[in-house]
Amino acid sequence: MNLLQTHLDGIRKTFPDLVSAATESAGGVLTIAQSREGSPSATQDGQWIHSAYDPRKEAQSWAALQTKEWHAGELGVVLGVGLLYHVEALVASKPVGARLAVVIADIAAFKDALAVRPLGPWFNAIEWIWGSSDEMATQLASKSAPLRFFTYAPA
């Protein structure tokens, strides 16, 4: 069984609608390339979305900067998934009492990430947001917590 199918099977019980959306998506919007340190990285339309050298280290440095102003009780919101390095790093460094939501603007990119990145328990610590722009805005508005937005610029 391939990594994508393993992930979809593993998250189906908790996130059945997300699995359906990913299954219906064609994927293939990210071009996967091996980074110099060996883990997968990716480009989209010729632009690196994570470091071509060490995507984990880059994500950890970025997350450390983001968490300086993130407080307990806030819902951190990440716009975009990339290969999820930045999401994983935020989960690892989020303040006690803070929550994290990830807005999946492009379900095809999410599917590509599931096909190449191993998931850990951190995946279930995230509130996943997807759908139309109106649906995503409604989902975020219903969270009843102060929102702190994080954006992850391409490498």
Where do the model's predicted regions map?
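N-terminal donor/sugar-recognition subdomains of glycan-related enzymes
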Residues: M1-A155
